[in-house]
């Protein structure tokens, strides 16, 4: 299986399955000299880990990361950083009934068609459990970006099913299990999710993630556009079916006079473009939205086929998230951070000596 590595200079390779012995990652290309320990990664992992809320999967994993290489005397050496998280709460017997059947709208069928063989336990490699290693790698990227360049990345839940959330207080996003920017909406979210779980159904969600203080100049024209790589990074997350940069699909209804981000000596007057112009960062906030589908692992019977092509009825057992978007915020932050650090290192490698006489204007006046 190829396709397990992301990045050009800052490369992240992940490995492992949902019910395997462990998950792992190799982070290659990390700059040397960064103070780094497991605690730097554990905060983000604790935000993502399962079993922390009644509204997410009840699989309980400590997700304690071990740094195996690439750090000496508390600092990165510039060599590959090896990361491992052991799986400790697998319950593979829950999946025996799908060994020869396919859950509708799941990766079961396509993995079988591609490889002729699949690890059906918890979805194997297609499980969102894989994203734990992205979060660990992303925490390294986030620390470097903040320490060296003041770049900060903040995500939050912007919609759960029909409930759209206002951005009232971003400081409380990490203090509630929904990553809600509106503390007043939490009772409504809890009531909705409780009813959904009783129904045995699932629902989709929308996550917004913003990168602040990104310098202008990251990205390249045509095939290495910053927004194109952001879209690829976000689309690689399990269950993501749509990505928007800035105003996204809303631009269809806008006129040029509305959409253009006019400039003054004091700064940009708007940020409809989401911080990227011509595939290159403008110095404004990079604003990304992602839409996650409802998980197909539900207890409501659904039609499907078995490996012989016979019609069957599927009821998914096991422990699953009724809304995968609830735990997706740290994953989105990680993938945006990994993309930005990779482009920053690439930009520095080619353009470190570039001198531009045009002043850098503020992100927004």
Swiss-Prot record:
Gene that encodes the chain: aroC
Catalytic activity: 5-O-(1-carboxyvinyl)-3-phosphoshikimate = chorismate + phosphate
The keyword Isomerase is assigned to this record: no
Oligomer and partners: Homotetramer.
Cited InterPro entries: Chorismate_synth (IPR000453), Chorismate_synth_AroC_sf (IPR035904), Chorismate_synthase_CS (IPR020541)
Entry binding sites for FMN: 125-127, 238-239, 278, 293-297, 319
Keywords for the protein's UniProt record, in alphabetical order: Amino-acid biosynthesis, Aromatic amino acid biosynthesis, FAD, Flavoprotein, FMN, Lyase, NADP
PANTHER family named among the record's database cross-references: CHORISMATE SYNTHASE
Name of the molecule in the record: Chorismate synthase
Keyword Lipid metabolism: no
Gene Ontology terms, MF aspect: chorismate synthase activity; FMN binding
Physiological role: This reaction introduces a second double bond into the aromatic ring system.
Lineage of origin: Bacteria, Pseudomonadati, Pseudomonadota, Gammaproteobacteria, Oceanospirillales
Pathway field: Metabolic intermediate biosynthesis; chorismate biosynthesis; chorismate from D-erythrose 4-phosphate and phosphoenolpyruvate: step 7/7
Chain positions recorded as NADP(+) binding sites: 48
Record-listed E.C. numbers: 4.2.3.5
GO biological process: amino acid biosynthetic process; aromatic amino acid family biosynthetic process; chorismate biosynthetic process
Organism the protein comes from: Marinomonas sp. (strain MWYL1)
Alphabetical list of PROSITE patterns matching this protein: CHORISMATE_SYNTHASE_1, CHORISMATE_SYNTHASE_2, CHORISMATE_SYNTHASE_3
Note describing how the cofactor binds: Reduced FMN (FMNH(2)).
Cofactors demanded by this protein: FMNH2
Family indicated by similarity: Belongs to the chorismate synthase family.
One GO CC annotation: cytosol
């Amino acid at each position: 299986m190829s396709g397990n590595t992301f990045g050009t200079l800052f490369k992240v390779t992940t490995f492992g399955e949902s019910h395997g012995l462990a998950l792992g990652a190799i982070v290659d290309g990390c700059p040397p000299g960064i103070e780094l320990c497991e605690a730097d990664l554990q905060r983000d992992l604790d935000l993502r880990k399962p079993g922390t809320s009644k509204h997410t999967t009840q699989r309980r994993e400590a997700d304690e990361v071990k740094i195996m290489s690439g750090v000496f005397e508390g600092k990165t050496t510039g060599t590959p950083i090896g990361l491992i998280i052991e799986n400790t709460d697998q319950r593979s017997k829950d999946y025996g009934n799908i060994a020869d059947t396919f859950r509708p709208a799941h990766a079961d069928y396509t993995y079988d068609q591609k490889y002729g063989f699949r690890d059906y336990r918890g979805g194997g490699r297609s499980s969102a459990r894989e994203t734990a290693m992205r979060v660990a790698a992303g925490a390294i990227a986030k620390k470097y970006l903040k320490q060296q360049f003041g770049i900060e990345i903040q995500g939050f839940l912007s919609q759960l099913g029909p409930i759209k959330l206002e951005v009232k207080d971003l400081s409380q996003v990490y203090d509630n299990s929904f990553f809600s920017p509106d503390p007043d909406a939490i009772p409504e979210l809890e009531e909705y999710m409780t009813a959904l779980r009783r129904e045995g159904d699932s629902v989709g969600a929308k996550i917004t993630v913003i990168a602040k203080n990104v310098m202008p100049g990251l990205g390249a024209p045509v095939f290495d556009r910053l927004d194109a790589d952001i879209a690829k990074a976000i689309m690689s997350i399990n269950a993501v079916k749509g990505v928007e940069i800035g105003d996204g699909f809303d631009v269809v209804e806008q006129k040029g006079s509305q959409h253009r981000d006019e400039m003054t000596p004091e700064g940009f007057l708007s940020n409809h473009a989401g911080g990227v112009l011509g595939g290159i960062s403008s110095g404004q906030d990079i604003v990304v939205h992602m839409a996650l589908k409802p998980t197909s692992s539900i207890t409501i019977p659904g039609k499907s086929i078995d490996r012989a092509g016979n019609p069957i009825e599927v009821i998914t057992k096991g422990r699953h998230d009724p809304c995968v978007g609830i735990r997706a915020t740290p994953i989105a932050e990680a993938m945006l951070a990994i993309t930005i650090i990779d482009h920053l290192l690439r930009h520095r490698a080619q353009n470190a000596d570039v001198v531009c006489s045009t002043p850098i204007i503020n992100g927004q006046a």
